[in-house]
């Protein structure tokens, strides 16, 4: 008697498993056929459907490229832009400057230039070396006789009161 019940229970579990996997597959098919927020209706003609989908993808790609061009401030006259670059090769080439559409706005350029390549006293996006910036690892005090310590840098005068002792007893 118990063997019969276990067989029925196993059959019921198998049916539940089949139904749940079928429902999950149907859900994933519905999700994969979505474009944006609307549902693409499936037609009997698959060729027309695939052509429409390809056209939509091409349109979306073109719109994204146009948007990227507008964001980066690229001009259609490439020659004019290169002439301007030849005239103005100065101290800005070591900074990461993003070309904005309104180049006359100096404040916007300063804000963009705030992000430098390395993490110094004020590097990155405004902040100095933070814990998230693990790629820049430095050892030691990075001061000393050869490097010059903080001489000629901001805050050098304030830091002279704190003297570190070297073992040789030279008093400065």
Curated annotation (Swiss-Prot):
Residues 27-172 are annotated as: Disordered. Induction: In the adult brain by sleep deprivation (at protein level). Up-regulated after bacterial infection in the whole adult body and in brains of some flies. Keywords: Antibiotic, Antimicrobial, Coiled coil, Immunity, Innate immunity, Secreted, Signal. Residues 1-25 form the signal peptide. The keyword Glycosyltransferase does not apply. The gene is nur. The keyword Electron transport does not apply. Residues 45-74 form a coiled coil. One of its GO terms (biological process) is defense response to bacterium. It is found in: Secreted. This is Protein nemuri. Antimicrobial protein which is essential for the homeostatic regulation of sleep. Promotes sleep following sleep deprivation or bacterial infection and increases survival following bacterial infection. Likely to promote survival to bacterial infection in two ways; by contributing to the innate immune response and by promoting sleep during sickness to aid recovery. One of its GO terms (cellular component) is extracellular space. Disruption phenotype: Adults display disrupted sleep. Consolidation of daytime sleep is decreased, particularly in males, such that the number of bouts is increased and bout duration is decreased. Adults are more easily roused from sleep and have impaired sleep rebound, thereby recovering sleep more slowly after sleep deprivation. Mutants infected with S.marcescens or E.coli at zeitgeber time 18 (ZT18) show a significant reduction in infection-induced sleep during ZT0 to ZT2 the next morning. Detected in the brain where it accumulates in the dorsal fan-shaped body following sleep deprivation (at protein level). Expressed in the adult body. Residues 35-50, 58-90, 97-108 have a biased composition (Basic and acidic residues). It comes from the Eukaryota. Residues 109-172 have a biased composition (Basic residues).
